[in-house]
Design a protein with these regions (language model features):
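Bacterial Sec-dependent N-terminal signal peptides
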Residues: 1-8, 15-61
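Extended, small/polar residue-biased N-terminal targeting/export presequences
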Residues: 79-143, 191-211, 216-221, 560-570, ...
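A structural signal for short loop-to-beta-strand junctions that line the ligand-binding cleft
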Residues: 129, 308, 369
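Conserved functional hotspot residues or short segments at active or partner-binding sites
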Residues: 380-589
Length: 589
């Protein structure tokens, strides 16, 4: 038996060697063909280059050909000889992602399985139920956080706090938000069975929900702040954003708007063409808005307004912050460069790069950084230089160059858009952050209180005027205390760090009584802290309750009355002389 086994082994090895030789031969043949193809490509690319640059270009193209050939040969060997069978999509996908990660954060690869993700990003559309979900620690499951108005989740009767028990019979206990979200999404028109547990009810609820095309609202709210000042909240630039803004501007003007507050805070950008179309409403036809400059000639473009505007003289204030980026920076930066509006708030993010979506073989896609953009003054506001190999360099203030607006005001490139009027937002205490942010409060005290409140109050006052009463807040406060709500107090953390340093430097023993006294003073007194921060906690609690009755639009409308930056913008728009002086040369605040 042993001899037969050895003979069988030899036979199998001979077959394996022949297969391996055949694979190596095929690999060698493929590599030779690839090499010839790459050399031809390199030659063609060189021929298209001016003579004085041909030597450098030829060397570059040859190096590209060599590296591609090396990569192809390397993976062929891995596939042929590695001890375990490789998943080509995963292994090569990781290689691609590592390569792109060394460039900039915006150049990304999307395999066929992730093409829907790119489409959602570009259009703001996806197939689903239209609801924000959050993970509930106490239930160890995801819950409905915020159903969007008039979308499947809301029309099916889902409410804030509903626990997602199962989807099409699959148990969702312990599953995180990405997993549950992926199962809630799907092709529009498809249906699924959802089982939920509603707080306060013992019996589970089952419902059949049909997915629809969900368009996340790029303009969740607009309205009149005063008799003459309009307000528009624009949260992203996706397909149709300009159409929404146009409708809002026209409607607000019909209702008496004489000046506008355009809120671009936390707007991460999106479509450049949508930004140009929005600016077209406020500047004359034929105005140059933005130029893009890249490596290829076709990346060099100039975008001008092509339609008649709605209003070129109405005062406009653009509210911005550190999360205002890309297309929203083109919008506020152009308003600043053309002295068409005042920019208020804090410095913007500083993204002056343009991405182009490209199709790849086998239904894969990529989003590729192809150009820098330059707003009307000629400046690029990119704040970070990506130097390859994952290295970043923030543009130093000393290297930022001066440019001039239409009226001669000095503005700078690099580092984002500096506001004409700097207004810091109200600071957010840690206790409020922990109470309101999903995933930080293990007691879920705010969500549970809101769900209970809504179950006991069929209706509330209009969104703009509703406010939690003192009695309601006292009930919330007692619930937080009874439920054992805790949060990370920065003062305690800093004191612990200080004690460590004092021990290391040998001062702790001498100051021990003082340290212990300070520790005692800083111990949690939750009741006192909830009283001290009552006003701002009430604001967040009120907003959460309002969203259950009037959805996202109502929550925004309610919050505006407490917004320090909005108040300052209204004050400015009520003062025409100050507004005009800011847009005069060298007049900034």
């Amino acid at each position: 038996m042993k001899g037969n086994g050895t003979q069988g082994e030899r036979k199998r090895n001979n077959i394996l060697e022949r297969k391996q030789y055949s694979s190596e031969k095929n690999s060698s043949t493929n590599n030779t063909r690839m090499k010839r193809t790459l050399i031809i490509i390199a030659a063609v690319m060189t021929a298209m280059t001016p003579l004085k640059a041909q030597n450098t270009t030829a060397e570059h193209n040859l190096e590209v050909a060599k590296q591609l050939e090396t990569f192809s040969t390397l993976y062929n060997y891995l596939d042929m000889m590695y001890v375990d069978t490789l998943n080509a999509e995963k292994v090569i996908g990781k290689g691609i992602n590592s390569m792109l990660a060394s460039l900039d954060p915006y150049t990304e690869y999307y395999p066929e399985s992730e093409t829907k993700k790119l489409k959602r990003m570009m259009t703001g559309k996806y197939g689903g139920i239209g609801s924000v979900i959050a993970f509930n620690f106490k239930e160890d499951a995801c819950v409905i956080e915020e159903p969007y108005y008039n979308m499947p989740a809301q029309t099916a009767g889902l409410k804030k706090g509903d626990v997602i028990v199962s989807i099409d019979g699959e148990d969702m206990k312990g599953k995180g938000t990405p997993y549950v979200s992926e199962h809630l999404r799907g092709d529009p028109g498809t249906s699924f069975m959802l089982t939920i547990k509603r707080p306060g009810e013992k019996k589970l609820r089952k419902m059949k929900i049909t997915r629809q095309t969900i368009q996340t609202p790029s303009l969740p709210y607009y309205g009149m702040l005063t008799d003459s000042i309009g307000y528009i909240s624009l949260v992203e630039f996706t397909e149709g954003s300009a159409k929404e803004v146009r409708h809002a501007v026209i409607d607000l003007k019909r209702n008496g708007m004489q000046s506008l507050l355009l809120d671009l805070r936390n707007n991460g950008g999106g479509s450049l063409t949508e930004a140009v179309s929005i600016l077209n409403m406020f500047v004359p036809k034929g105005t140059s808005i933005v130029k893009t400059k890249g490596k290829l000639t076709k990346a060099n473009r100039e975008y001008k307004t092509g339609d008649l505007p709605i209003d070129t003289i109405m005062p406009v204030v653009c509210l911005v912050n550190g999360n205002t980026a890309s297309a929203s920076e083109i919008t506020c930066g152009t308003m600043q460069d053309l002295d068409r509006g005042v920019v208020m708030g804090t410095k913007t993010y500083g993204k002056g790069l343009v991405q182009t979506p490209l199709e790849l073989p086998y239904n894969a896609n990529m989003k590729l950084t192809t150009a820098h953009y330059y707003i009307p003054s000629g400046r690029c506001i990119q704040a970070i230089k990506y130097k390859g190999e994952g290295k970043e360099e923030v543009v130093a203030d000393s290297l930022r160059k001066d440019f001039k607006t239409l009226h001669g005001r000095t503005v700078k490139d690099g580092g984002g858009i500096m506001p004409d009027v700097k207004v810091e937002p109200d600071s957010l205490p840690n206790i409020v952050y922990y109470l309101s942010a999903a995933g930080l409060d293990s007691t879920m005290v705010m969500m549970e209180y809101v769900v209970d409140y809504v179950s006991k109050h069929p209706t509330i006052a209009p969104a703009r005027s509703f406010r939690v009463s003192d009695a309601d807040y006292e009930t919330f406060k007692q619930k937080a205390i009874n439920d054992g709500f805790k949060y990370d107090r920065e003062s305690e953390r800093f004191l612990k760090d200080l004690i460590k340093v004092a021990r290391f430097e040998g001062y702790y023993d001498r100051a021990k009584p003082e340290f212990e006294a300070l520790q005692k003073k800083l111990r949690h007194d939750l009741a006192a802290e909830l009283d001290y921060h009552k006003d701002i906690i009430c604001q967040y609690l009120t907003s959460e309750i309002v969203s259950c009755y009037y959805y996202q639009a109502g929550a925004i409308e309610n919050s505006l009355q407490y917004d320090k930056q909005v108040r300052e913008a209204v004050k400015l728009l009520r003062d025409p002389k100050r507004y005009a002086s800011i847009l005069s040369p060298e007049k900034t605040e």
